[in-house]
Amino acid sequence: MWEGRCAKAPGREAGPRRHDLNVSLPQANLPHPATSELRHCCLPPPRGPRLKAAIAKKYRLVIKTMGYVGWSLFWLLLWDVAVTVDFMLFLTAKINLPLMPLTLLGSALVVLISFRNSSAYNRWWEARKLWGAMVNNSRSFARQVLTLLDDPEGKVNPVKATLLRRHVAYVNCLAAHLKGLPCPDEVRAFIPSEEFARNGATNNFANDILTGSAALLAKEYKAGHLDSIRLARLESTLVDLSNAQGGMERIANTPLPYPYVYFPRLFISLFCLIVPVGLVESLGWFTPLASTVVGFMLLAIERIGTDLQSPFHSSEHQIQMETICETIERNLQSMQRDALGGDRIG
């Protein structure tokens, strides 16, 4: 078809066209420079480094996932290998273990684990919602302090910055209190030294800091920098903070009943011991692979439930309270800087 379009017309001699006079045949087949640059710009970057980085990331994820279960998976693999080798090489009698009881036991075990994990997740999610309420109430408290407290003539009321510093100390001490740890030394920068010295003499230093803030507001009311309506509004916010703290302490001090933790772990261990015995007759040398995969899933689910049931303790899925406290501190610093033109809190 293309040859027909380029054929010589009748009555006309074939010859080079005007725009082809200065172009030789080898040069006519070369791509246009602009086209070459466009193709070069549109080419994707080399995939070698990105591919290596992706493989390394996946490898680290697999190692982290395997390490999450811990030594339980390793001992399970050894047990599976021992059962398989003993059956395939040394055992002369066949094991005719029906799979129906094993299937029913596995189904009942999954229901039990799901019920326990659902209760554990509800505790974790409630703890996260309470810390979210703590963030919101902290912003409300800072906003009310900065806007409702009256300033003396010609200067900014220093109690505003003092209350914000005390609140940063409060949330950090609360995070340590929920972990069962003493108040960190960094809090010294936010509260008076004599007040911090009482840290070891009380069983709830975070609540003492909140009580001290309420006492400061009462002094401001007596000094005429607050009226009764604004004081009541600030006190209502302090009550919201105290309610959130009480909810967190309820979760921290009331663990799941012991059977919720012990029986799922016991049943999973027994099931993992029985699985290779029931599968070795049909799977042979592939028994360790199948049994270890099944055991890994059950052990991982059990470990997740164990971590979620204690949301404030150090684990893979703990509530990131330090990060939340840093968020509250940054929010209060920004609010103070915008309202008072001050520097960092503390």
Which positions does each model-derived feature cover?
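Structured inter-helical modules in multipass membrane proteins
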Residues: 144-260
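Transmembrane alpha-helical segments and their cytosolic interface motifs
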Residues: 68-76, 249-281
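Membrane-spanning helices that line or support transport/gating and their immediate boundary helices
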Residues: 120-124, 133, 144, 300-311
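Juxtamembrane "helix exit" motif at the C-terminal ends of alpha-helical transmembrane segments
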Residues: 79-95, 269-298, 302
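Cytosolic/matrix-facing juxtamembrane and C-terminal tails of multi-pass cellular membrane proteins
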Residues: 295-299, 304-346
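Short Gly/Ser/Thr- and charged-rich N-terminal loops/segments
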Residues: 8-13, 26-29
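N-terminal juxtamembrane/topogenic regions of multi-pass membrane proteins
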Residues: 34-132, 151, 283-285, 327-346
